[in-house]
Amino acid sequence: MFDLCKMPHVLVAGATGQGKSVGLNAIITSLLYKKHPAELKFVLVDPKKVEFSIYSVIEHHFLAKLPDGEDAIITDVTKVVQTLNSICIEMDTRYDLLKAAHVRNIKEYNEKFINRRLNPEKGHKFMPYIVVVIDEFGDLIMTAGKDCLLYTSPSPRDYAASR
């Protein structure tokens, strides 16, 4: 198991048959065992439609999806950019909440919220970790283009929101 705060960005790379999918599934499974559904939401992107389909049974518990989305596991490449854009909007909203709470990261924010030092009437809410897992990222970039790179490039502010 690993700490999301210490590894906010991970790229798994390797040749065909080297265990990338096995590694991703091990990471996902370890997080499922470590966190309660209220603490963690996954956004799974699976252009091949077969790698993450086993997680459809946890759709109502651990998977996040857009309000107008049909499936929690994104298999349509055209919907990936829209989903990543929505995640960036959520990230900006979270930064505003972190700033208003005078904290530096999500862990401190949630501790403050749990200890009732943040007022829900002022928009404060418990923030689950959001973990985006994209299978075949290289293929996605080739298909969806530069838009995916814009939304997935790590920035210093991403690091603060994930801690």
Question: Which residue stretches match the model-derived regions?
Answer:
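N-terminal low-complexity segments that are often proline-rich with Ser/Thr-Pro
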Residues: 160-163
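Conserved helicase/translocase P-loop NTPase motor core
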Residues: 87, 112-117
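Cytosolic-facing regulatory segments adjacent to core modules
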Residues: 106-109
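P-loop NTPase catalytic phosphate-binding loop
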Residues: 1-103, 122, 127-153, 157
